[in-house]
């Protein structure tokens, strides 16, 4: 089960991808929306990470580099394989630790296993 806040963030990421006419819902869409979450912002602040730079990098990436996944017609974005893996990994972690529901920080941590994603690149930059 996922938290209500995470559901909202996933929906916003979906809407972002849909508004951009992207065929796929990517980790970059998700991370951009996660950057607006209060818990994630607190975590970044605690770690000395400037969320503004992550948002700027992600926005530029989505605008310029995701043109290859723009559909010719309106489509419902499909979650990418990496998006699905992150959700599954976070859910498995929460289930194995008996912590209840998947929250935004669980997703953020699970993203780090996707070493080849630009989302992780921007987080580590």
Name every feature range the model reports, one short phrase each.
Residues 1-125:
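Histone-fold recognition with a strong bias for associated Lys/Arg-rich disordered tails
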């Amino acid at each position: 089960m996922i938290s209500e806040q995470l559901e909202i963030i996933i929906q916003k990421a979906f809407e972002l991808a849909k508004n951009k006419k992207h065929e796929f819902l990517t980790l970059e869409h998700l991370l951009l929306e996660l950057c607006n979450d209060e818990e994630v912002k607190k975590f970044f602040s605690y770690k000395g990470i400037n969320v503004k730079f992550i948002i700027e990098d992600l926005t530029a990436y989505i605008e310029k580099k995701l043109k290859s996944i723009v559909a010719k017609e309106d489509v419902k974005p499909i979650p990418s394989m990496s998006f699905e893996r992150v959700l599954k990994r976070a859910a498995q972690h929460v289930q194995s630790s008996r912590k209840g529901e998947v929250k935004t920080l669980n997703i953020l941590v699970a993203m780090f296993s996707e070493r080849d994603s630009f989302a992780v690149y921007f987080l580590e930059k």
